[in-house]
Amino acid sequence: MKLIIFEGIASSGKTTLERLLADKLPNSKIVTEGDTLMPLIENRDQVAAIDYLRKLITVFKKETADYLIIDRFHLTHAFRSHASLKEFSSIEESLRELGETLLVLLTIDTDSIKARIEETMSYRRDQWKKGAQGTLEEKAIYYAEQQEQLKRFQQVTTLPSIIIDTTNKDWENCLLQIEDT
């Protein structure tokens, strides 16, 4: 089994690319953020986050798909629990044991985050809009900070990884970058 983990801030294109990739890959399954994220947006309990991820990995072991396309995983949990990625090293080891793993970090140019969030809010459900509280400006600042932390995590991950800039929404080019890895 091959695992492709998408990380990135809200509105970076994770769902779009996951669906496009699943259409191209035979016998693939998308694991949504509804399955991978703990219910609390700010969970500072690193032990609970790691335990939650371990349980998910146990579920993944039973999966028969050739490709698991995962929407957010340990980088997001490390960010939300204010942990270092080192504290999630056992999770990375377990992911490697499952099979070939690729971590794909999607980014948006910092100057474009506010506009992308605003655009995304126009078509997302009300529940998504409530996810990050505050004004549009405050949300943009929060997501810019999250993106910078995710980039720092990407630099120290032990998993094979790539960063893809999705500012221009060139989804075909993004798919090519993933396929070339």
Predicted regions and their residues:
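Hydrophobic anchor at the beta1->P-loop junction of P-loop NTPases
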Residues: 6
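P-loop (Walker A) phosphate-binding loop of NTP-binding proteins
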Residues: 9
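Conserved lysine of the Walker
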Residues: 14
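Conserved substrate/cofactor phosphate-moiety recognition/catalytic segment
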Residues: 19-67, 80-81
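Loop/turn-to-beta-strand initiation segments
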Residues: 64-68, 99-102
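Charged helix-capping and loop-helix junction motifs
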Residues: 84-91
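A glycine- and Lys/Arg-enriched "phosphate-lid" helix/loop adjacent to the NTP-binding pocket
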Residues: 95-149
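NTP-dependent small-molecule kinase module
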Residues: 144-181
